[in-house]
């Protein structure tokens, strides 16, 4: 029989009644959002505003970054260490990405900034491990809904982070501060919080114990 909207909503609610869902959702809202906020919203203003890049130069950086981000998920997929170590990798890589944003906040050398942006692009591939973590964290009959919820969280996170960093940049500029530094610090802080939440909130009972 066809599932009603009420039944579908109720079963999504079942996911939130599982304690380990919260860590997965929080991390999911921040990792992809951090990279996409850089690539989609702040890359051009950062390179042109802080380093004086032309539109063509900025476009070249964006093209290379997009190509990197296109292929690195396959590499991380092949390197997937399995359910137990995967969570450690997710915690470590999300903290490392936060550290790179922190470094970007204070970096004033154009070539070093471009290299750092490309390193961020290479590291962004770890996000594919989050999908594998979702599959390992729920029983088979709930996997589809869990993946849907995770994907929704990712795109809600993108919208929220771009909105928040836009507000913060406007506030910083109004008060005479460097808007790009404020944005990078904000993203670094959010990644650190998300990684910490993922590390310490309950984990799925389906995963092997350490």
List each language-model region with its residue ranges:
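Juxtamembrane intracellular "pre-TM" segments in multi-pass secondary transporters
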Residues: 1-25
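Multi-pass alpha-helical transporter architecture, strongest
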Residues: 105, 185-210
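Extracytoplasmic gate region of multi-pass secondary transporters
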Residues: 18-73, 161-162, 166
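A membrane-interface helix-boundary motif in multi-pass transporters
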Residues: 54, 167-189
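Structural signature of the two symmetry-related core transmembrane helices
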Residues: 88-102
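A late C-terminal transmembrane helix in Major Facilitator Superfamily
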Residues: 140-173
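Helix-to-loop junctions at the C-terminal end of transmembrane segments
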Residues: 72-85, 169
